[in-house]
């Protein structure tokens, strides 16, 4: 008998579900897995593990609205594909959500055309039909499908998807001290510090627009901000993207050291800034990369940027590389947005909550796009979020 169980942090086969998610969907189509768990079964989302009695089959992730329900992710355990389970699962799931919809890659010339045709045939066999409406998700063009006879207004689809993505972007604004206190409270009561650092790095990794064939340089300081960068470097390396690390100095926070060691074990190249690397040398080096990830200073930085970091930041700003700043632009005051010099980013990925300095007029001169990512940080004496 097919049955569905809610997925949360206590699900017994959570690691298997995570691995299937990584196997079934390319990284450009994935959101961070911790977010899947964080907002699963909340705010109009169902994240369900699927079983045939006690036999695990896979998972389904659905956005549930008043007008329609939309399958965002659906995957069957690798060894059970072609076994008829996909049809049985959809048959049972449509009893729960009669106005069920999904999206597939359109049938047009592509490297995976055969796979696209098989997917279309599968869903048609299971009572879905194309709706002549195309949408873009995670930068990928898709074609909507719905149960036979079903009409979908594009605005209902967009409303559903927007609600989901808005659900893990925190809108609250904190001071640097308030953010530090929230970090400490979360680590003391909910999430291990290494796990929280991993979540931060994973969030930055998914926001970045890097692809296979790109060259990425992670420029890292000595604090936890650098640790986020080491997580990103390892994830890039896993995906086959060329990545290197430039250390300002060989000094690490405890958690940063942990993730830097993983990078070393996995063969990621790194260099250490030295006196021979003047502005021109750095500029020439930076121009050879497609992306630079700025992890030099975190939100706790204040005062003036001194050499050799001053010349390094100037070279980043003058280079042709696209720049992503982790949590805050290095050199910027997290409360005021002021800086004598700071990294100019194409995108800044704020972690947890927006910081006051990031939304000032002064900061806007240095930030191309500002994105804030919820990683489950909880403020004491507030409405605690699922972590």
PLM features per residue range, with description:
Residues 76, 82-95:
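Conserved acetyl-CoA-binding loop-helix of GNAT-fold acetyltransferases
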Residues 170-180, 289-387:
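YjeF_N-associated NAD(P)HX repair module
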Residues 171-213, 379-387:
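Positively charged, low-complexity intrinsically disordered leader regions
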Residues 206-295, 304-325:
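Nucleotide and nucleotide-moiety/phosphate-recognizing core
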Residues 1-31, 155-163:
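Short amphipathic alpha-helix that is part of the acyltransferase structural core
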Residues 24-52:
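Active-site rim helix/loop that mediates acceptor-substrate recognition in acyltransferases
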Residues 96-114:
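Conserved GNAT acetyl-CoA-binding A-motif
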Residues 49, 55-63, 68-75:
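Conserved beta-strand in the GNAT
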